[in-house]
UniProtKB/Swiss-Prot annotation:
Organism annotation: Haemophilus influenzae (strain ATCC 51907 / DSM 11121 / KW20 / Rd)
Family: Belongs to the 'phage' integrase family. XerC subfamily.
Subunit structure of this chain's protein: Forms a cyclic heterotetrameric complex composed of two molecules of XerC and two molecules of XerD.
Source organism phylogeny: Bacteria, Pseudomonadati, Pseudomonadota, Gammaproteobacteria, Pasteurellales
Effect of residue 272 to F: Abolishes DNA cleavage activity
Descriptive protein name: Tyrosine recombinase XerC
Listed PROSITE patterns: CB (PS51900), TYR_RECOMBINASE (PS51898)
Disulphide connectivity of cysteines: none
Positions of the Core-binding (CB) domain: 1-85
Record keyword Lipid biosynthesis present: no
NCBIfam families found in the cross-reference section: PRK00283.1, recomb_XerA_Arch, recomb_XerC
Length: 295
């Protein structure tokens, strides 16, 4: 079994020119697979059948592997067995048609209205706080991705008509409205922006005058959340998810939210309908006299 694996590593390294990191990941997964096979007294790849592949997955799950890691292990095994088929050592790939356990759908976390109010209730006049408040207000008001906000220039924003021009995924441009609170916060920021000695046309700059980095935004939001007494970790995703959830709760217009978020597929936006249903179910449970549903 090891001889075939060594030929496979050479194939990946020389012919496929895969990175050492990727090869190491494959090695880790297949080494673990061989250990499971050895426990079943399987010492030849020709002994591996579809039932054996399913056993490998079941045993790996029993050992504590999560869904994502199980999918990686199956993928590594399937690719290797496909190589053996190409080499004529196997007639068919026994892993073909076998799926790893589906990854559970993790609903994004969001803040409720009171938490948003708590987050933004800060009127500090420090220039860096004025900048951060503008970032927070704009992200929550428009649902921008972190990369979209970080890439904004001065000419991207129009506080008079309250619109921001965004370059999203796939280099697609869209225009997103924002509210009067965000507009006011941005105007306040523009009054003090020159104090940071900006070196380019970036809307949001660091204290060194450069375009603020992704990491700096993440750290500032985390710090702001702690300072405002939020119990949960604050990050750009949470602001975007909160925007989407609150928009759906207020309007139920999935297509409009899709456009605002810049999703190319409606299915991506539909995850927020699950969040919205959770909110409605909670209201129902609290309000209806016969609503005590079993959980």
């Amino acid at each position: 079994m090891l001889t075939a694996l060594n030929r496979y590593w050479d194939y990946l390294r020389i012919e496929r020119q895969m990175s050492p990191h990727t090869i190491t990941n494959y090695q880790h997964q297949l080494d673990a697979t061989i250990k499971i096979l050895a426990q079943q007294d399987i010492h030849s790849w020709t002994q591996v059948t579809p039932s054996v592949v399913r056993f490998i997955l079941a045993e790996s799950k029993k050992q504590g592997l999560k869904e994502k890691s199980l999918a990686l292990r199956l993928s590594a095994l399937r690719r290797f067995l496909s190589f053996l088929v190409q080499q004529g050592e196997l007639k068919v790939n026994p892993a073909t048609g076998i799926s790893a356990p589906k990854q559970g759908r993790h609903l994004p976390k969001n803040m409720d209205g009171e938490q948003v109010q708590q987050l933004l209730a800060n009127d500090s006049k420090e220039p860096i706080d004025i900048r951060d408040r503008a970032i927070l207000e704009l992200m929550y008001s428009s649902g921008l991705r972190l990369s979209e906000l970080q890439g904004l220039d001065l000419n991207s924003i129009n506080t008079r008509v309250r619109e921001v021009r965004v370059i999203g995924k796939g280099n697609k441009e869209r225009v997103v409205p924002f509210g009067r609170y965000a507009s006011h916060a941005i105007q306040e920021w523009l009054k003090v922006r020159a104090l940071f000695n900006p070196k380019d046309e970036a809307l949001f700059v660091s204290q060194l005058g450069n375009r603020i980095s992704h990491r700096a935004i993440q750290k500032r939001l985390e710090t702001w959340g702690i300072r405002q007494g939020l119990n949960s970790h604050l990050n750009p995703h949470k602001l975007r998810h909160s925007f989407a959830t609150h928009m759906l709760e207020a309007s139920s217009d999935l297509r409009a939210v899709q456009e605002l978020l810049g999703h190319s597929n409606l299915s991506t936006t539909q995850i927020y309908t699950h969040l919205n249903f959770q909110h409605l179910a909670e209201v129902y449970d609290q309000a209806h006299p016969r609503a005590k549903r079993k959980k």
